[in-house]
């Protein structure tokens, strides 16, 4: 998704968890200084509020349901093989209660209060699942006040074509390539994982992540 060509060269990556950020950072790590941009590849703690007013940023988005499934399996395997990020005590309990993302999502609004409470606990305890796009962009008013700072938005569903467009826009070397989906550097889930959600799970997640869809629609409407 092309936005604007910046006059300034300082370009900051806002890394939202489980939106293909690791793959993008890996692809750009050797090409952060191009003719049109000096790129800064930040960690998850860097937000829109950290971008200086006279500088620019880019980030990637992903459907909240897909992001949920990806986050579940990523944390279930503790980030391996690329990382080895141990569970928190809360995550350990959550994964003792739920083996699949579909099981967790199904119980979110269960009539059985024990299932519902356990599901809510897991949703609030598992890293990436328990954060929001708004954690990085504050609120709609602030996001819109900084829209001129946002020069490119990747969509996980069109990542390859978006990346080619990004390279052309900022004169980044053609040698910069996204890692193969199954490589460690991509930090993606094993294709053998059961990523399917049934209808109840989908409806529950759309209800739970209602504010996330507000953000996605705001991005599409604004850019």
Model-derived features with residue positions:
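Membrane-interface amphipathic segments in extracytoplasmic regions
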Residues: 1-223
